[in-house]
């Protein structure tokens, strides 16, 4: 595996791989990698000949009160994990390389509707930052495919919409959330939890699972299910941000008759914001 830090170097390496007839996959990350990220790399190896991972802690997607400065930078450990996972090339630029004109005047990409509500309501500007950096990475790397985890479900929907609306010739794969044995979705932010909070955290997925079970049993009072779920989160020790049931593809509010749903939630344990979701298909 080689590590490159400039756009020029990456484009040259991609051109060589393309010249050899290789199919190229991109796995964008912010580093501090865990087993969920490496699962994406391993899936990419199955679907492509040349796997590019990127590590860039994107300042454009962090709000002023968020944890940009605290976000762990673990490049050496990440390189080892990527190598073991079968990555061919790591692109690890700094902010000056990605935003050479500075962020103040940076052209930004906005994906309306699907980015609104849910995490978009709690984190203004977040998905604009995500869409902008992903567009830049797609333009630089020109991958055939790109892989993202379903844990960040709204982000995945934003990226699918972006690619569709801008006619990008890139196939987007959403991969299932990787979980700890107790059900907690793997996340770089889990490291912020203390021992007591870590013991509480799996309740988030259990509560989503209970809602999914009720829906599959025929319950269609979605507002009532969400209200009970929010109360269950509070009783477990969370400070809920949201818990909603949406139509899976469009992310519009769910309605009776929808056959593919997703239950999405965000909640705080202390100062750590956890997100999770559960897809529910109704036969």
Swiss-Prot record:
Signal peptide: none annotated. One of its GO terms (cellular component) is cytosol. It is found in: Cytoplasm. GO terms for biological process: pantothenate biosynthetic process. Beta-alanine binds at residue 61. It comes from the Bacteria. GO terms for molecular function: ATP binding; pantoate-beta-alanine ligase activity. CDD domains: PanC. (R)-pantoate binds at residues 61, 155. ATP binds at residues 30-37, 149-152, 178, 186-189. Pathway: Cofactor biosynthesis; (R)-pantothenate biosynthesis; (R)-pantothenate from (R)-pantoate and beta-alanine: step 1/1. Its main location: cytoplasm. It catalyses: (R)-pantoate + beta-alanine + ATP = (R)-pantothenate + AMP + diphosphate + H(+). InterPro entries: Cyt_trans-like, Pantoate_ligase, Pantoate_ligase_C, Rossmann-like_a/b/a_fold. Pfam families: Pantoate_ligase. Its EC number is 6.3.2.1. The reaction proceeds by a bi uni uni bi ping pong mechanism. Homodimer. Catalyzes the condensation of pantoate with beta-alanine in an ATP-dependent reaction via a pantoyl-adenylate intermediate. Belongs to the pantothenate synthetase family. PANTHER family: CYTIDYLATE KINASE/PANTOATE-BETA-ALANINE LIGASE, PANTOATE--BETA-ALANINE LIGASE. This is Pantothenate synthetase.
